[in-house]
Regions:
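Interdomain hinge/linker elements that couple catalytic modules in large macromolecular machines
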Residues: 1-156, 164-165, 169-171
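Active-site beta-strand-loop-beta-strand hairpin of nuclease catalytic cores
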Residues: 179-186
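Short beta-strand or tight-loop elements
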Residues: 161, 173-175
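Short, surface-exposed charged micro-motifs
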Residues: 126, 176-178
Length: 186
């Protein structure tokens, strides 16, 4: 589960890792290319949002988010990272591309919650990936980090149980999850 992911077909495979990569690649390319492009075509008719036209940029942002799951990330830090590789991109473009990845359910965003002010903040969200096998595929099997992988699993389980999940800080201490269901905040 933690290495190859949780897509149902993978559980029935022998030689899981080799076959899983091919299977996950097919899912990823289908979602990235077909689903996001179709969603953008529908959206183009009803909104003035920027159309996702650069699939390479979209994939680079997906790889970056996969490499930092469970860490606070800003749109500016992603734009700066991409600029460091020689490509200039605006923060608005990065924001639109992240939105496309979350609308396609490849990533989920956990917004920061001000514990004292009891309100959502729009900076330094954490992103979690839909499946750890997909993360392994995107990162070419490097840097298996148990802590962030477990945090990703807990996040997805909290969502599955119907909680709204945020992240926060109290003083200098990070709060991994602030969960809300109905009027109850834990």
């Amino acid at each position: 589960y933690m290495r190859c992911g949780s897509f149902p077909y993978i559980a029935s495979m022998s030689d899981k890792e080799e076959k899983a990569d091919t299977y996950i690649e097919g899912i990823y390319n289908t979602v990235i290319i077909k689903d996001i492009e179709e969603r953008q075509a529908r959206k183009e008719k009803t909104t003035d949002k920027r159309k996702i036209t650069d699939i390479t940029l979209l994939k680079n942002i997906a790889k970056y988010l996969a490499s930092v799951i469970g860490s606070p990330v800003s749109v500016k830090s992603i734009a700066d990272y991409i600029a460091s590789s020689g490509r200039k991109v605006s923060q608005n473009t990065v924001s639109d591309y992240i939105e496309a990845l979350t609308e396609a359910f490849i990533f989920y965003s956990a917004e920061r919650y001000d514990v004292y002010g009891k309100q959502l903040l729009k900076q330094n969200a954490k992103y979690y990936i839909v499946d750890l096998g997909l993360r392994r595929y995107l990162l070419s099997k490097r840097n298996y980090d148990l802590g962030y992988s477990l945090e990703n699993i807990v996040y997805l389980e909290l969502l599955r149980r119907g909680f709204m999940v945020n992240v926060g800080k109290i003083g200098n201490q990070e709060v991994d999850f602030i969960v809300k269901k109905g009027d109850l905040i834990e």
